[in-house]
Amino acid sequence: MNITGKGRCNVTNDCDRETLLASIPGNGRFLYGALTRFTPRDTMAFFEALGVSLKVERGNRVFPVSDSAFDITNALERELKRRRVRWARDRALHIETENGAVTAVQGEKDAYPAQAVILATGGVSYPGTGSTGDGYRIAEALGHTIVPPRGSLVPLVCAGEDCPAMQGLSLRNVAVTVYNGKKKAVFRDFGELLFTHFGVSGPLVLSASAHLRRWEGEHYTIEIDLKPALDEQKLDARVLRDIGENPNREMGTIAAGLVPHSMAPVVLRRAGLTGSEKANSLTKEQRRALVQVLKHFTLELTGPRPVSEAIVTAGGVKVGEVTPNTMASKRVRGLFFAGEVLDVDAYTGGFNLQIAWAT
């Protein structure tokens, strides 16, 4: 919890139910009942009642006013103590049952008798925090089907050398579209993107990754519109204006006025230019080629980064084997599930924590 939201803890997202459900590409409808009974406003009221002042930022993201995730975890610990909840610092090995009902949790140190157990072990992302995937093993041993875990909200790997050449470059206010092998758009949004040594990352890419669920036998490309505020005709006029104002300058200089400096050589090469051409020597066809690259900067995606680098784990306990109104197991009486151990996942922005609170 203390590392969420870059250490600030994006507690929830202050949006309506429809927006919330639309932000959960992984089995969002299964969560309808839970998110109706415990809404983002309920989450905010809960923490404010515990003494944590909250604020709403861009994109309706909710954070502690202090910008410290520790305020959230400290408040939860205080509430546990107030309610005299017993802490057992142990590792659960398995859940014991008798006649199809929970009887105890067996740990490494002791056994803990119980008539009801909530399995809230999270996924397999961020293994350095202790996420081992034990919950999947425990649930599977009790007869539950586990949808194979994979990374969601994860950076994406691109083919070629263009991304390494632009490593560290962050683009704002760009439009991104991801196409599958049939040239069908599977994701489209506007925002920020980051080039890395392996490919692309940033908020837009992380959200896009949640939609890319089939990599075997599928081919994805990501198209970046570097000038979404201008259509091709207006962008062509903008390029023509820049050339007219600086006819004797090299195209490398002109391009650096259109895109960040480290991106200019890549854009020019894709347009069939070297950058040494005089601006006034550019033909109409060359200018149009440049506009096409600016509006349709395309990269081939080869796959996601490892699940250990993902913000969220997709996959987990199959939701068809869980009662949506109670999160109770349909296999074992007294067994319940909460959070990321279930096969549910959402976009970045506080949605995944809201799922955790609601379930």
Name every feature range the model reports, one short phrase each.
Residues 88, 106-116, 188-191:
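Core beta-strand elements of the Rossmann-like FAD/NAD(P) dinucleotide-binding domain
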Residues 116-162:
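Glycine-rich loop(s) and the adjacent beta-strand/alpha-helix scaffold that form part
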Residues 2-86, 91, 195:
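Conserved N-terminal/central alpha/beta ligand/cofactor-binding core
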Residues 88-101:
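A conserved short coil-to-beta-strand element within the FAD-binding core of flavoproteins
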Residues 62-69, 152-161, 304-321:
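Flavin (FAD/FMN) cofactor-binding core of flavoprotein oxidoreductases
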Residues 125-127, 155, 201, 312, ...:
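Glycine-rich phosphate/pyrophosphate-binding beta-alpha loops
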Residues 88-91, 265-345:
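A glycine-rich dinucleotide-binding beta-alpha-beta segment and adjacent secondary-structure elements
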